[in-house]
């Protein structure tokens, strides 16, 4: 596999050519970035945790009939995914005021919003991913009106599922980001959820303590990033309950075997 062709490298993942046509291998890196890579560190074990948490969530979405690019996890850091044409938008769903929304509109962080709000951001690091409207999206041809409707419908379904999943383990889903892509199957095309869903792309607060269990720990120099991600994995039933966190990386449950996450 050393000679496999690299298709794309982003801030937190690498895409490689897959074993079959129409597939890719998604590799999760340990890089932690914020503010479009203005802040960057390597955090041992983060990629392993994001791979496992994202696998857990995407498996649930697939079983519920919410279409995604996910096929299966290959190992501790890699997933087999369907190749899609990514729509150049970050789709953000907000349930509670936090981050840029609080700053932009002067709403106190932690305020529950009157209803879930969907926002679109154009994927362009050089421009700091500017917020855009549906008018921008259709005018510049990033997506058609029907595709926007499909993306929004997916975002609402994902939000409903994730809110229940996390609330069931004592975590409040404050907001999250997804990306969507066009999956071509013969003469058919459909919009599917792509990228990842993990504490890197969600704001997750402990219901009882309001502790942050997401990438805000890195953005705000709070420390304890891996420990927070481990706690999310533990509550979701991914981590072995009886295994204490170790400095060399998280210990995770894969099927019936306990395997140790090692940095690549």
UniProtKB/Swiss-Prot annotation:
Gene from which the chain derives: purC1
Gene Ontology molecular function terms on file: ATP binding; phosphoribosylaminoimidazolesuccinocarboxamide synthase activity
Family per similarity comment: Belongs to the SAICAR synthetase family.
Keywords, alphabetical: ATP-binding, Ligase, Nucleotide-binding, Purine biosynthesis
Biological or metabolic pathway of the protein: Purine metabolism; IMP biosynthesis via de novo pathway; 5-amino-1-(5-phospho-D-ribosyl)imidazole-4-carboxamide from 5-amino-1-(5-phospho-D-ribosyl)imidazole-4-carboxylate: step 1/2
Organism encoding this protein: Mesorhizobium japonicum (strain LMG 29417 / CECT 9101 / MAFF 303099) (Mesorhizobium loti (strain MAFF 303099))
EC number: 6.3.2.6
One cellular-component annotation, GO: cytosol
Transmembrane segments: none
Protein name per Swiss-Prot or TrEMBL: Phosphoribosylaminoimidazole-succinocarboxamide synthase 1
Signal peptide positions (record): none
